Structures are given as C-alpha cells and as structure tokens.
Amino acid sequence: MAETRTSITVRPDLSDYRGLLKALNQMDKEAQFELKNDVYSLSAWTAQGIERAGFAHPIYPKQAAIVARTVRPARDRVPTVYVGGGKGRASGGANAGQLLFGNEFGGDRNAFGNLNAFRNGGYRFPPRTSREGRGNTGYWIFPTLKGMQPEIKKRWFAAVNRVMDNWARYS
C-alpha cells in the first residue's frame, strides 16, 4: 500500500546556497545560535501569514482552519515552516494532514460521493486549482508564500549578513 504524505515542509531551494551554508557551519556556536534565533522570528512571521490566510480561506473554511492550526515555524538556519501532521480532527475523523493536500490543491469533481452523500453536493474538497509549473497553484498556502517570498528573502539575507558581520568583527 502506498504511503500518503500528511505534512509539507516549506523551505527554500538551497542548491544555490551551498557555499553560504558551508560558511555558516564555520561560525562558532554562539553566532549560529544568534542566526537561528533571527531566522526563527522570520519563520514565525511566515507561519503567521500562512495561518491567517488559512483562517480567511472562503472555500471550505472549516477544513482550512483545521489545517491552519497546524502551521508552525522551525528553528533552523534557513526559514522553514511545517504544515499538517496528525493533529486536528474533522468531524469525519480525518486529521489535518489528511485534509492538507485536498484543501490546498483541490480535488477532481468526479471523485467520491454523489449529490445526496454530502451537504455540499458530494464533494470533499474544493475544485482542483489551475496548473502552474510542475504542480498546481494552490488556494492559500503557496499563493501566500509566493506573495511573501521577496520579503522573506530580503529579511533572511539581512539576518545572515548581520550575524556574519558580527562574527567576523569579533572572531
């Protein structure tokens, strides 16, 4: 039986930043701790933006609220946010992770149920979102991240530069 994913870890593509990460590994523990604290506040800001978008989601708002309650920041050198997991339960017993992908990307309109099965006409998730690149656009997590991305990048570079300048000055 195939495994199903029940969470998303959102972090930047680090393929272009391998040299930077190696330099960050050379810093002492105090400088790394300072960087992780700065980046954690950025991750918390990002998680708060995603969570607010979930609570404001107009289509299937109860599902989105269950998923939004699971958004949490991670303490790392790069901005990282976790969404989903086993917490939160819907009335049918599904946890937030099981609702995550259907609520974010939608579902096919011919899948599961009939017009008499559910109050909403037989559909468990909103209509599938349009294609974009290798996947779908999403309803609230990925559009929110896309809008926040320039500010996240700017704040992360500022935090890294500030910590590296302090480390270079005092080491």
Model feature map: region roles:
Residues 2-38:
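Long, hydrophobic N-terminal alpha-helical segment
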Residues 28-31, 50-54:
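Alpha-helix capping/termination and helix-coil
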Residues 2-14, 53-171:
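Charged, low-complexity interaction tracts
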Residues 35-50, 152:
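Non-globular disordered terminal and juxtamembrane segments underlying protein topogenesis/assembly
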